[in-house]
Amino acid sequence: MLGMQYDPFEYEMPWRPNYELRCALVWFATALIYLFWAAIGFFSAGVMLWFAAIMLAFGFYYLRPGLLLWEKQGRLVGAPPSFITLKAFRELLGDPAHRNDLWIGEGFEWSVSEIQALTQLNARDEKELITMAVADRKRRIALDLIKRKDTWLHPKQALKHYALKVAEAKREMGSPWIHGVGEDNVNQWMPLNHADGHTLIFGTTGAGKTRFFDLLISQAILRGEPVIIIDPKGDEGMEKNAREACKALNREDAFVYFHIGHPEKSVHLNPLSNWASADEIASRISALLPQDSGSAPFTGFSWLAVNTIAQALILCNISPTLTGLKQYLEGNMEQLVVKTMTAWFKQQMGQEKADRVMRQVLGHIPATSSKGVAALIDFYRVKMTDKQSDVINSLLSMYEHDSTHFSKMITSLMPIIHQVATSHLKDLLSPSEEAQSDKVLFRDMQELIANRCVVYIGLDTMSNASVGAAVGSLILADLTAVAGSGYKFGKSQVPSPGNAVEDFRESRLPKFDHSTHVNVFVDEANEVANNPFIQLLNKGRGANFRLFV
């Protein structure tokens, strides 16, 4: 957009020697000479004063444009990082005119003038620009030191300080003159609803992406909206700023800390707790498998195995966990078969009759022994031909599968399962039924969002990249399931269930108000990107999810 004062016939070249300031200095020097001559009586004092006044007039005429040009060229040197206190930040955001805006910092709008200035800069040699910028920075550092009283009291320390500042100026990264082509830096606001289409933030290492994240996170917290922060590298500053923002609102209890590198301080979180259909669980796990050429049969078989176990657990009204899946993938299938068939008998016959049938079928044979399992299978296939379950049929097919072949087909799956279901991650990601009853220690993503919590998730990928990436992918998939429920059900209740699996599904669905905007911040997104994450980016807007990547 062209400015109101833009003149297409006016040409300005600001990146040149400052002739105006030089002229002003010459005119002022000449005026001093005339004043000196007037003082010593070299010529007529009146004439000398008139000449001095003329020289001063010319000097002041050139001084203003010279100073403006000096200031403009000085901006090419860049500026030190600016900071704002949380109190001042809240006052800034409290402006009624920007109640529905997002503050993105200070800067200027690009117009024809700025584009022309940048074009002229690009036409110059970059080394020349760097030399000019460093030289100008030296002059400014020297002027600042001269103004300070302690410079004259401690000249040696002042010289050391000068050398240190000059060295820092030479080490600055990037191209600071890009930000210097604008005239004035003012507060820049973006309509908040523009963020509904998600926001991509990119820049080189150390360019300030994470600190910009801090600004956006603090604003989301101050708006009282739920915030999910996924931080693969575990930035302490990001966690601290989020915690301080909660403290400023007197909502310290709303801050939830999850970090796989600090299990002693972390809450427990089950990344398989939210789903609308049980096969989503298998899809989350199989998404972690390597997608190499020729791996499709192994991936498909692994998906089928996980899905079968998850369906069986759900039929038993047991919440699927990573350790539960690991337990039955490694063996103990007899135990799962007995649990599943017992649950099915109770659903079809009632508690009392099912217990009586179990006693008749098993007698004194242990239920989990090979003979006991065989007896239950025979009864199921012979006596319950009209009341069979697809879940049990799939489970029996897997149970009777050749164990050697089964182990080979899930070779790529087991390392992934071991990564996220052993050691300290076992308790963090697979809480027991007892732990899940502890609402302080165990938290659920749907409950966290419903309570508008601020959830910091540190993945510690610097220590173990593969484990951190796997955990991050699972958590993002869990978030995608929460968002997906907003598409399917919105604020309404789930349709009446038709069987026990549907009933259990209803109990796992989020029951928060989907009109609430959920802010998801994913730093270093390449570490955790997967198919559910792409789906969340593609369709999350309809569920009021805002992603900042």
Give the ranges of each region predicted by the language model:
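Accessory regions of macromolecular translocation/handling assemblies
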Residues: 1-229, 233-252, 315, 346, ...
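P-loop NTPase motor domains
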Residues: 180-183, 192-195, 202-205, 211-545
